[in-house]
């Protein structure tokens, strides 16, 4: 099988110098549900609440998966009380889409609001200056969508230009940065609010002896929302840029569309992930890096800071080994995976927030761990790789 990467959209912007018109991230906010689970005890809870404690071998396998995940805890909307009220969520293959939808259409925008409010507070400008809203989720589908609900929750202008992105997968966080960059740079004076909100209730269900991928989903995904505000030409003294979005591209690995699949069924969103996914991503990341950084004369991957989507520990280990990265390069990605699990579209934005906060705490010279150039990587169904070249700003 060929693994040569094919560029689908967005040729690289060959601009080696900073342009005033380039989009900047002006604020970041994140939020999680108050409820959280300890990964070490989660197998006991999961098999008990799904009435599956008799599946002893399956439970021990799940425990091994959890122990190898390098995840310490995850925040979840799911509680024992919620599951007892809705037992159809706990049985594999039981029709439960209506129940899931009723919960998700409320919880997804609410969590998104919490993240958005934090970003807006950091931004420090009137909410009326938001001109565009992009909302992304893999959790639930509704019309009017979560974007519409969020405009009401935040009190945005009725004239705000909305875009709802459903079912995009784990590459979506990086893809939303690409989209926000395009919107900001083509709408002078525009301020784009991007919100990624994910609730893993869409994939929660009891174990299946026939579908072992389901156990990986139950171990891996967590709930969280992240928001960024993007615009060009920050107002001096009124707006403080955090990162510059320099260029962006999306690629797919040929003949891999069946390797990572999420499908909406009567029992909710099903999950399939081939064991070949980590190695396929690992084999193709460097080609994306070369295309991205060649215009800027950069080929030392340890000279940049990294925002790598932690789809799983195997992906982090594989990329680190393949590229010869120093251990600290993927520290932020590993930390977010450890504390939150895989947050799907919100994950890279959580990592971006972690990087800039730790850079300030450690008294680094820039928001990018003291370095100038960085990369955001998102991986998702397709197999799709989204790559965003970013530039840090000095920390005053």
UniProtKB/Swiss-Prot annotation:
It is an enzyme of class 2 (transferase). One of its GO terms (biological process) is polyketide biosynthetic process. The active site is at residue 170. GO terms for molecular function: naringenin-chalcone synthase activity. Pfam families: Chal_sti_synt_C (PF02797), Chal_sti_synt_N (PF00195). Keywords: Acyltransferase, Flavonoid biosynthesis, Transferase. Pathway: Secondary metabolite biosynthesis; flavonoid biosynthesis. Its EC number is 2.3.1.74. The keyword Acyltransferase applies. InterPro entries: Chalcone/stilbene_synt_C, Chalcone/stilbene_synt_N, Chalcone/stilbene_synthase_AS, Polyketide_synthase_type-III, Thiolase-like. It catalyses: (E)-4-coumaroyl-CoA + 3 malonyl-CoA + 3 H(+) = 2',4,4',6'-tetrahydroxychalcone + 3 CO2 + 4 CoA. The primary product of this enzyme is 4,2',4',6'-tetrahydroxychalcone (also termed naringenin-chalcone or chalcone) which can under specific conditions spontaneously isomerize into naringenin. PANTHER family: CHALCONE SYNTHASE (PTHR11877:SF104), HYDROXYMETHYLGLUTARYL-COA SYNTHASE (PTHR11877). Belongs to the thiolase-like superfamily. Chalcone/stilbene synthases family. This is Chalcone synthase A.
């Amino acid at each position: 099988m060929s693994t040569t990467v094919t560029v689908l959209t967005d040729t690289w912007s060959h601009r080696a110098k900073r342009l005033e018109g380039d989009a900047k991230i002006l604020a970041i906010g994140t939020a999680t549900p108050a409820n959280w689970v300890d990964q070490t005890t989660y197998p006991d809870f999961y098999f008990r609440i799904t009435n599956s404690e008799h599946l002893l071998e399956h439970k021990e396998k799940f425990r091994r998966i959890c122990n190898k995940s390098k995840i310490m805890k995850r925040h979840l909307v799911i509680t024992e009380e919620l599951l007892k009220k809705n037992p159809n969520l706990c049985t594999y293959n039981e029709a439960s889409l209506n129940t899931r939808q009723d919960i998700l259409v409320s919880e997804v925008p609410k969590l998104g609001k919490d993240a958005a409010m934090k970003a807006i507070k950091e931004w420090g400008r009137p909410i009326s200056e938001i001109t565009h809203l992009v909302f992304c989720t893999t959790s639930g589908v509704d019309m009017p969508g979560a974007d519409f609900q969020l405009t009401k929750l935040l009190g945005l202008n009725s004239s705000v230009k909305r875009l709802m992105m459903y079912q995009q997968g784990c590459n979506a966080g990086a893809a939303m940065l690409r989209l926000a960059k395009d919107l900001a740079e083509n709408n002078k004076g525009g301020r784009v609010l991007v919100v990624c909100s994910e609730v893993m209730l869409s994939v929660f269900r009891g174990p299946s002896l026939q579908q072992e991928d389901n156990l990986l989903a139950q171990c891996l995904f967590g709930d969280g929302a992240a928001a960024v505000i993007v615009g060009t030409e920050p107002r001096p003294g009124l707006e403080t840029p955090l990162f510059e979005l320099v260029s962006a591209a999306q690629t797919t690995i040929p003949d891999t569309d069946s390797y990572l699949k999420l499908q909406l069924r009567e029992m909710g969103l099903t999950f399939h992930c081939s064991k070949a996914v980590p190695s396929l991503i690992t084999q193709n990341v460097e080609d994306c890096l070369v295309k991205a950084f060649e215009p800027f004369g950069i080929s030392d991957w340890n000279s940049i800071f990294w925002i790598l989507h932690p789809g799983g520990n195997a992906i982090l280990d594989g990329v680190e080994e393949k590229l010869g990265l120093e251990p600290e390069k993927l520290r932020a990605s590993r930390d977010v995976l450890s504390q939150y699990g895989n947050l799907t579209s919100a994950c890279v934005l959580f990592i971006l927030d972690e990087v800039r906060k730790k850079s300030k705490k450690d008294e680094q010279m820039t928001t990018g761990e003291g370095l100038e150039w960085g990369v955001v990587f998102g991986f998702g169904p397709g197999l799709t790789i989204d790559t965003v070249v970013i530039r840090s700003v000095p920390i005053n």
